[in-house]
Amino acid sequence: MERLKRMSVFAKVVEFGSFTAAARQLQMSVSSISQTVSKLEDELQVKLLNRSTRSIGLTEAGRIYYQGCRRMLHEVQDVHEQLYAFNNTPIGTLRIGCSSTMAQNVLAGLTAKMLKEYPGLSVNLVTGIPAPDLIADGLDVVIRVGALQDSSLFSRRLGAMPMVVCAAKSYLTQYGIPEKPADLSSHSWLEYSVRPDNEFELIAPEGISTRLIPQGRFVTNDPMTLVRWLTAGAGIAYVPLMWVINEINRGELEILLPRYQSDPRPVYALYTEKDKLPLKVQVVINSLTDYFVEVGKLFQEMHGRGKEK
């Protein structure tokens, strides 16, 4: 048990990057943290950390030991969580990886509600473009939008994210409303340069498909910048509904070409274990599944309102 405590202290030092930060997190003194690491090094007869007055770094032996510590500590935590699961109460830290837009537009609000419902649960939300790596980043679950490529991982489809062509009402007042896909070529286009969202198809009610690869003077790989351009009236864009759902509800943006359909992006949860899915992971999967059902209904309502205009 004492060795497990020392391993936990060492792992915290590595993860927080300093003895001081680890001491603050563990509510221990800095000297106690330092002594614990020194005892580990004496016991193992290897140097785990390179220390300087400004920073610490892992030695090669320290890197190997840290990886082992992390695996063992996760296993201990999982055992405790499985026992608590008998009471249908998820506990522990849920480590989720996703894109920054998924975090900002979906998971921030969703996890806030989850933690109110489950006081024994905490969340570590890791973001990035592309989404963080499930194995390398030590995550419980990764949420991905679009086609999957990780054949070694287990996955579950959570739903689909509708895609919309939209623009600010101020832009449409000045430049007019496009009635068909061909009209988009005469408008200012806001281009999201990350594939596959920079090319798409629109399908007419009679089944005729039009493939579009529009280019514009405004190009970015940052979703937030694209939305800012949209609301500023800089042009028209093709984006996931979750990026602009609040702006549409507030009346700042309007969905265009409502008679035309576009394939939604599939959304998946990726994880490593098929049969022993921790309760905390199951909870977030269920919550996201419910979310995308509601988003689908909302999209149909929005499209219906657009067709009536």
Curated annotation (Swiss-Prot):
Keyword Transcription attached: yes
Disruption phenotype: The mutant is hypersensitive to p-hydroxybenzoic acid.
Matches recorded under SUPFAM superfamilies: Periplasmic binding protein-like II (SSF53850), Winged helix' DNA-binding domain (SSF46785)
DNA-binding region: 19-38
Keyword hit for DNA-binding: yes
Keyword annotations of the record: Activator, DNA-binding, Transcription, Transcription regulation
Domain HTH lysR-type: residue ranges: 1-59
Any one Gene Ontology molecular-function term assigned to this protein's record: DNA-binding transcription factor activity
Activation and inhibition: Activity is regulated by p-hydroxybenzoic acid.
Entry's Gene Ontology BP terms: DNA-templated transcription; DNA-templated transcription initiation; positive regulation of DNA-templated transcription; regulation of DNA-templated transcription
Family matches, as Gene3D superfamilies: 3.40.190.290, Winged helix-like DNA-binding domain superfamily/Winged helix DNA-binding domain
Record function comment: Transcriptional regulator that activates expression of the aaeXAB operon, which is involved in the efflux of aromatic carboxylic acids such as p-hydroxybenzoic acid (pHBA). In the presence of the effector pHBA, acts by binding to a single target within the aaeXAB-aaeR intergenic region. In the absence of pHBA, binds more than 50 sites along the E.coli K12 genome, including genes related to biofilm formation and several genes involved in stress response, suggesting that it might play a role in quorum sensing in the absence of pHBA.
Family: Belongs to the LysR transcriptional regulatory family.
Protein's name in the database: HTH-type transcriptional activator AaeR
